[in-house]
Amino acid sequence: MPLSLLLTCLSTTVTLVSPAVLDPCSAYISLNEPWRNTDHQFDESQNQPLCDNHMNGEWYRFTGMAGDAMPTFCIPENHCGTHAPVWLNGSHPLEEDGIVQRQACASFKGNCCLWNATVEVKACPRGYYVYRLARPSVCFHVYCGHFYDICDEDCHGNCLDTTECACSPGTSLGPDGQTCFDENECEHNNGGCSEICVNLKNSHRCACGVGRVLRSDGKTCEDIEGCHNNNGGCSHSCLGSEEGYQCECPRGLVLSEDNHTCQVPVLCKSSAIEVSVPRELVGGLELFLTNTSCRGVSNGTHVNIVFSLKTCGTVVDVVNDKIVASNIVTGLPKETPGSSGDIIIRTSKLLIPVTCEFPRLYTISEGYVPNLRNAPLEIRSRNHGIFPFTLEIFKDHEFEEPYRETLPTLKLRDSLYFGIEPLVHVNGLESLVESCFATPTAKMDEILKYYLIQDGCVSDDSVKQYSSRDHLAKHFQAPVFKFVGKDHKEVFLHCRVLVCGVLDERSRCAQGCHRRVRREVGEDEDSAGLQSQTLTGGPIAIDWED
């Protein structure tokens, strides 16, 4: 069975650390390993695949037998010493462009950009390039190097004379005046493709999304109308009917969101990620995660692997409007037959990348006193998982003991201690309370509302923020108040929380109180379709009479 049929959906963009103060053209790390070169084909029978999981956003230069620069065209899988080689999906910059951002893509199972990350590139005065490379979210990924054609001083190849070079079609002369770099035709009008353009060495090709095929012109796409055409685009079974067709999966696999691809079931929860691999797909292989001490356990029908966002080598990153947790399940032959009697294997290796996505933006509502049930807020992402926060009312400024058993009576001029608490503590993430406002009813769209925090700024001078050891937790103190009117005896709080990567110095969380940025950046976040859900607790009657 092709490994591509086992892939869960992946789209990962890695957050970079802040750039170094020194000019990266003179402060870089050389990558000179011969196996990085695009000509080096990986042989699984002789070696283990390599991975660049040691990288952490430093600047690098390709030298020696690794090559001159990153390739700007799709590299087939099982090259550059690994399963999923990484190439630069975009042209190299000119020296006057300074530092630019480009997309880096990893090729795997026929998909030239199954994973992607953002890297930074700079053209240096001496004719070479340096790259600020992010750590891959999963293994096995390696950044590739490539030897580009050079027009030498003796005027061999396509040289016009001893001082001027002419490059072959599909390439252009680099900043050193000698090297011919591949042109990315996809950067110009998407290469003429109606949907997907894939840049190749000295050329390009068009492709279509799932369930669609190229027309005879090789550029435009059309819907697959039945199982007779490319199996309906289905990864496994295609069933035709008078109304059309539908894809079906074998027992143990589930249909993904594209309604065409079958994948291993993955359950995304904030407390744990659960992967369940059908036993017949495993055979005599032993399954483990990036941290090989985390291994699968068989229940007879499935091999199950359960891990958290903080264990087993799981990588957590912020990608646009999502928190993305990634790991990879690897299957290798057992050294001895297992207890289930496996004495043969049907595949030499199994790779199942796993990704869970959680939304970044949450809206939490609570009365002055939590409901006695104290149910946590669980916000469901559009497709994949939940990441819970609670709005707690604490007994004092230590913010260690929230009210649990009894509802206190709060009086005017008392201090109200409240905070945003994550139910899962994950390193590498932080939160920003974008707004907190009070209403006399549980409705968030109540016309009568009073803001304590707005645009990440404390809007009431009586509100005090306390520091917290956890980047995701936020603690505040405010005087107890009520709304004017004898009928207004209850107060509800509503807080809007955004989650970001700690190392992303350009994130909304890092900017903190900044109303202008809130209008510009926040509107983009809202337009991205962030989902929120309201949990309402309380209310409590305020003892406001002397």
From Swiss-Prot:
Stretch forming the signal peptide: 1-19
SMART domains: EGF (SM00181), EGF_CA (SM00179), ZP (SM00241)
Start and end residues of each EGF-like domain: 182-222
Subcellular location: Nucleus envelope
SUPFAM superfamilies in the cross-refs: EGF/Laminin (SSF57196)
Glycosylation sites recorded in the entry for this protein: 89, 116, 299
Gene Ontology cellular component terms for the protein in this record: nuclear envelope
Pfam families recorded: D8C_UMOD, FXa_inhibition, Zona_pellucida, ZP-N
GO biological process, any: renal system process
Main location: nucleus
Function statement: May be involved in hepatocellular function and development.
UniProt protein name: Oncoprotein-induced transcript 3 protein
Lineage, uppermost ranks: Eukaryota, Metazoa, Chordata, Craniata, Vertebrata
